Amino acid sequence: MDEQPQGMQGPPVPQFQPQKALRPDMGYNTLANFRIEKKIGRGQFSEVYRASCLLDGVPVALKKVQIFDLMDAKARADCIKEIDLLKQLNHPNVIKYYASFIEDNELNIVLELADAGDLSRMIKHFKKQKRLIPERTVWKYFVQLCSALDHMHSRRVMHRDIKPANVFITATGVVKLGDLGLGRFFSSKTTAAHSLVGTPYYMSPERIHENGYNFKSDIWSLGCLLYEMAALQSPFYGDKMNLYSLCKKIEQCDYPPLPSDHYSEELRQLVNICINPDPEKRPDIAYVYDVAKRMHACTASS
């Protein structure tokens, strides 16, 4: 998080300190059992805090969703159902969902903490230094991401929001895919469709045409992410671009080719088949993961 300039004090961080005795019987299912330490992120309708459980000392991320009380009963039920699905995921490259509960009319989600950094920060670092990420480094992280998505898809769970900011990297170089599957519950259609707040560079053509999201939409986003790791910018990025021109570029798959002198034919080909306007022609995650495993083994030993 950026530091506050001296002399400029931000709003005080809300405190959710226990007002009453601990509830050991409730485990991770009440705010009374957590000490909130600091805010580490915020979305349009949610805030994420670093916290620690007062029962076992485990550091966690606590996501508080304010829009929950604006949802109708069906949306709430669907959301809780989705979180229950996410709790069943168990993979070293997927952020673990520990618990969720409603308290003070807010939805609280307790997650594994991954605060060492994320892929967007790494991309910015290389861009600032005017250096490309070495291909073997690209595969080192990408193969872990594919492993995470393979686990999710095998359990019929879509991610729905794959982008560099949702790919966390621990201090030991382990990838953790986070912010799983819940974006559609905590967004406003009007905001997503008509504003450039959080420009949707990774939006697939079928989403532009409102044909619904499917597993192949995750593959499109995965291809965009692989491209961005190599080019240090989104395939459809452009200066002074409005939403209409962005959508046109996406529909036409109009993006600059990756430099062939820096990146292998295999990497460039994988990007091309993932960023295909026709979802049916995109590979499934098993295929992408196989290529990533082969290329990781090949580049790691060279």
From Swiss-Prot:
GO cellular component: centrosome; cytoplasm; microtubule organizing center; nucleus; spindle pole
Alphabetic keyword roster: Acetylation, ATP-binding, Cytoplasm, Cytoskeleton, Kinase, Magnesium, Metal-binding, Nucleotide-binding, Nucleus, Phosphoprotein, Serine/threonine-protein kinase, Transferase
Enzyme class: transferase
EC number: 2.7.11.34
Short name of one Pfam family: Pkinase
Compartments, record wording: Nucleus; Cytoplasm; Cytoplasm, Cytoskeleton, Spindle pole; Cytoplasm, Cytoskeleton, Microtubule organizing center, Centrosome
Gene: Nek7
Cofactor names: Mg(2+)
Protein name per the record: Serine/threonine-protein kinase Nek7
Catalytic residue list: D161 (proton acceptor)
BP GO annotations: cellular response to potassium ion; positive regulation of NLRP3 inflammasome complex assembly; positive regulation of telomere maintenance; protein phosphorylation; regulation of mitotic cell cycle
PROSITE patterns attached to this UniProt entry: PROTEIN_KINASE_ATP, PROTEIN_KINASE_DOM, PROTEIN_KINASE_ST
Phosphoserine PTM sites in chain numbering: S195
Subunit structure: Monomer. Interacts with NEK9; interaction takes place during mitosis; it relieves NEK7 autoinhibition and prevents interaction with NLRP3. Interacts with ANKS3; this interaction alters the subcellular distribution of NEK7 by preventing its nuclear translocation. Interacts (via N-terminus) with NLRP3 (via LRR repeat domain); the interaction is required for the formation of the complex NLRP3:PYCARD, oligomerization of PYCARD and activation of CASP1.
InterPro entries (UniProt xref): Kinase-like_dom_sf, Prot_kinase_dom, Protein_kinase_ATP_BS, Ser-Thr/Tyr_kinase_cat_dom, Ser/Thr_kinase_AS
Residues the record lists as binding ATP: I40, G41, R42, G43, Q44, F45, S46, E47, V48, K63
Catalyzed reactions: L-seryl-[protein] + ATP = O-phospho-L-seryl-[protein] + ADP + H(+); L-threonyl-[protein] + ATP = O-phospho-L-threonyl-[protein] + ADP + H(+)
Organism of this sequence: Rattus norvegicus (Rat)
Stated regulation of activity: Binding to NEK9 stimulates its activity by releasing the autoinhibitory function of Tyr-97.
List of residues that carry N-acetylmethionine: M1
Entry remark concerning the domains of this protein: Displays an autoinhibited conformation: Tyr-97 side chain points into the active site, interacts with the activation loop, and blocks the alphaC helix. The autoinhibitory conformation is released upon binding with NEK9. The NTE (N-terminal extension) motif is a structural component of the catalytic domain and thus contributes to activity.
Source taxon at top rank: Eukaryota
Positions of the UniProt region annotated as NTE motif: 20-33
SMART domains in alphabetical order: S_TKc
